Amino acid sequence: MVGEMETKENPNPTPDYLMQLMNDKKLMSSLPNFCGIFNHLERLLDEEISRVRKDMYNDTLNGSTEKRSAELPDAVGPIVQLQEKLYVPVKEYPDFNFVGRILGPRGLTAKQLEAETGCKIMVRGKGSMRDKKKEEQNRGKPNWEHLNEDLHVLITVEDAQNRAEIKLKRAVEEVKKLLVPAAEGEDSLKKMQLMELAILNGTYRDANIKSPALAFSLAATAQAAPRIITGPAPVLPPAALRTPTPAGPTIMPLIRQIQTAVMPNGTPHPTAAIVPPGPEAGLIYTPYEYPYTLAPATSILEYPIEPSGVLGAVATKVRRHDMRVHPYQRIVTADRAATGN
């Protein structure tokens, strides 16, 4: 009908939903221009976070059972202050971290208990401070007398007598549940605290990620699938570290066998005695020095070659008499000498 508001059920208190709420709150607090503007939005977000944490806490401790009604009677009489101490069994369980279990990550568990019961919950006594040096320094000082006592939980409440007694009784029952150590691997409260810490640190993994059980099932399915039997892969020879000796002709055709080599003055070349003429004589070729053997191929042609030599036989440099030794020296030829020019 028109004018009727559609009521929707609250989302289930799941870790994913709590992570989304925490991210929204962190985003709002990181925007300075919006701080203090959306007062109702911030209040509704805080209330939803408290509701989700309360439902998750109740499901963890009470086994997903409906908690008894938290309704309180009307106040009768003046405001009184009540308190009670619950000592922690550290002597029976010396290795158990009761302080971390009661406070929770960043004190969230203790704050949740305070919001539910309406009482103030504090951890006092020896070992209640994280900094042991600071605890020893404060021991014996005013307002630090509790450090001389054993580790305990102090519960205080201020309300009318009839209401204060009910609140204190509920808080004592909830704290006593925390003072009972759970077996390793079966502590649901510890798992919830670790999950909240991961959400606060931003390291919580979404539930949509494939679980290990599913991964194992997929691996088993892959192993059960038929496989194609193939022969062993051939073993390849190791790669050669050096280039093998070429089987074809040499790379430098300009270097040929030396047949005759005569000096300009007519005397035989010194290498002629070492390398005798004949088709069986030749140069020693090293196949692993390619960059050094290719370079002289072009420089050989820069020098004049005697007519008596063959192509490839390097001759000494001949002095040409028709060239000037000095740039300012005048060359006098036979024709000029006869004419006197």
From Swiss-Prot:
Residues 182-213 are annotated as: Qua2 domain. It comes from the Eukaryota. Residues 11-82 are annotated as: Qua1 domain. The modification Phosphoserine is found at S188. A motif (SH3-binding) lies at residues 276-279. GO terms for biological process: axon ensheathment; intracellular mRNA localization; long-chain fatty acid biosynthetic process; microglia differentiation; mRNA processing; mRNA stabilization; mRNA transport; myelination. The modification Omega-N-methylarginine is found at R227, R242, R256. It is found in: Nucleus; Cytoplasm. GO terms for cellular component: cytoplasm; cytosol; nucleus; synapse. Methylated by PRMT1. One of its GO terms (molecular function) is mRNA binding. Belongs to the quaking family. RNA reader protein, which recognizes and binds specific RNAs, thereby regulating RNA metabolic processes, such as pre-mRNA splicing, circular RNA (circRNA) formation, mRNA export, mRNA stability and/or translation. Involved in various cellular processes, such as mRNA storage into stress granules, apoptosis, lipid deposition, interferon response, glial cell fate and development. Binds to the 5'-NACUAAY-N(1,20)-UAAY-3' RNA core sequence. Acts as a mRNA modification reader that specifically recognizes and binds mRNA transcripts modified by internal N(7)-methylguanine (m7G). The KH domain and the Qua2 region are involved in RNA binding. This is KH domain-containing RNA-binding protein QKI.
